[in-house]
Regions:
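A glycine-rich, aromatic-flanked flexible loop/lid motif
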Residues: 65-69, 88-91
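Solvent-exposed, polar/charged alpha-helical surfaces in well-ordered, non-transmembrane soluble domains
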Residues: 22-33, 50, 93-100, 109-120
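Alpha-helical interaction segments
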Residues: 69, 85, 105, 119-120
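Bilobed periplasmic-binding protein-like "clamshell/Venus-flytrap" ligand-binding domains
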Residues: 1-16, 60-64, 106-142
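Short beta-strand-centered segments that line the small-molecule binding cleft or hinge
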Residues: 71-74
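Ligand/substrate-recognition segments at binding pockets and active sites
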Residues: 1-67, 136
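Short, solvent-exposed loop/beta-turn-alpha elements that line the ligand-binding surface or hinge
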Residues: 2-6, 52-57, 77-104, 133-165
């Protein structure tokens, strides 16, 4: 496996976000094993937002996807060709048609089938590669109890109480 003649590309990451820098370094080493030269370009956060995210000037990047709204439409809409948040410039007419049918449908089973079609298209075209889910760290003074972790990023302090001393 690998690329006999190899190739090179640049991973552009914000210089102020260590998890992305660390991930880029791991990817660089892994790509080297298959004959691919990945260069890491560190840029300031403001430049990353304007050049990479907004103006889509990059070969490759790492990004944390906001999953605060995990409805099918919210997660899949970002890949429609004309979506402002489609910063990877993904464009696929079949995907766009399936997504439009999904959001237009009033039948939940039909909507689900169209969303599955969208996911199949994304998977087959490798629109994105999800590589990690960063852990959540919480520092809590030991005088408090009742903090709960949730599968999504939620800070619910309703059950937080002073511990019995």
């Amino acid at each position: 496996a690998g690329f006999e003649d190899g190739f090179s590309f640049t991973i552009t990451v914000p210089s102020n976000y260590q998890p992305h820098i660390d991930t880029a370094q791991v990817l660089k080493e892994e790509f080297k094993k298959i004959g691919v030269d990945a260069q890491i370009q560190l840029i300031e956060w403001d430049s990353w937002v304007s050049d990479v995210y907004q103006n889509r000037q990059f070969q490759s990047t790492l990004v944390g996807v906001d999953a605060s709204n995990i409805t099918g439409s919210a997660m899949l809409q970002r890949f429609t060709s004309d979506n402002a948040k489609n910063f990877i410039n993904y464009s696929n007419a079949d995907y766009d048609a399936a997504f439009e049918k999904a959001i237009s449908s009033t039948n939940d089973d039909e909507k689900t089938q169209y969303y599955k079609e969208c996911e199949r298209i994304l998977s087959e075209s490798a629109a994105n590669v999800y590589i990690q889910d960063l852990p959540e760290f919480v520092a809590l003074n030991k005088k408090y109890t009742g903090y709960e972790f949730y599968p999504l990023y939620i800070q619910d302090i309703a059950k937080l109480r002073l511990a019995d001393e």
